[in-house]
Swiss-Prot record:
It comes from the Archaea. Gene3D superfamilies: Aldolase class I. It catalyses: N-(5-phospho-beta-D-ribosyl)anthranilate = 1-(2-carboxyphenylamino)-1-deoxy-D-ribulose 5-phosphate. HAMAP family: PRAI (MF_00135). InterPro entries: Aldolase_TIM (IPR013785), PRAI_dom (IPR001240), RibuloseP-bd_barrel (IPR011060), TrpF_fam (IPR044643). This is N-(5'-phosphoribosyl)anthranilate isomerase.
């Protein structure tokens, strides 16, 4: 069964709704140099992460410029896993992996030239549609067939993101057969505020896709 991460959770009410809906992971954005309504301050990030129950994964989503910056944020917030957008080279990602106990998800574009190098140092790859600043959450889809090629050719788990909604996630899972799917803007009533009904429909539609999708 395909796993589901709901990203850009900004408060405890949305966190609890995401957990109740059956999502496998809660994404908390902190430490990104881009303008997004989904980023929270350090204290809020700690509070959200601390309240994620057992068997659901809290994921700190960040764009660090140095390994030390990443380690500092991780030590303070104590997430279960880390998602790194932009900023770190494959070698730096490997150095980070050696300094923390959490799994690292590296965000890449499907045609990134260093994708195999990132796959070597990350525990999973998240394939997203990114903007000029390297941030995700664009609401735009990309070439799902290219991402399917990565599923077939790489040994690390592939997470599909970018423009997913309750309406298209079943088709996306059937096409790509990813380890997991990730959504932010596709289940919002406004920037940074989750539509709880949409979250529930997204989780159901992702997990009810044909069994061949994992």
């Amino acid at each position: 069964m395909t796993r589901v991460k709901i990203c850009g959770v900004t408060d405890t009410e949305d966190r609890d709704a995401v957990v109740t809906a059956g999502a496998d992971a809660v994404g908390i954005i902190h430490g990104v140099p881009v303008d997004t309504p989904r980023e929270v301050d350090e204290g809020t990030a700690e509070t959200i992460a601390d309240g994620v129950p057992p068997f659901v994964t809290s994921v700190l989503v960040m764009m660090p410029t140095t390994v030390q910056e990443a380690v500092r944020r991780i030590d303070r917030i104590e997430p279960d896993a880390v998602q790194v957008h932009d900023g770190l080279s494959p070698a730096e990602l490997g150095a980070l992996n050696n300094r923390i106990t959490q799994d690292i998800v590296a965000v890449v574009e499907a045609d990134a030239p260093a994708i195999e190098d990132y796959a070597t140092h990350a525990d999973a790859l998240l394939v997203d549609s990114v903007d000029a600043d390297g941030g995700g959450g664009t609401g735009e889809t990309h070439d799902w067939e290219r991402t399917r090629d990565l599923v077939d050719s790489l040994d690390v788990p592939i997470v599909l993101a970018g423009g997913l909604t309750p309406e298209n996630v079943t088709e996306a899972v059937e096409t790509v057969e990813p380890f997991a799917v990730d959504v932010a803007s596709g289940v919002e009533s406004a920037g940074g505020t989750k539509d709880h009904d949409a979250v529930g429909r997204f989780v159901r539609n992702a997990k009810q896709a044909p069994e061949g999708a994992v």
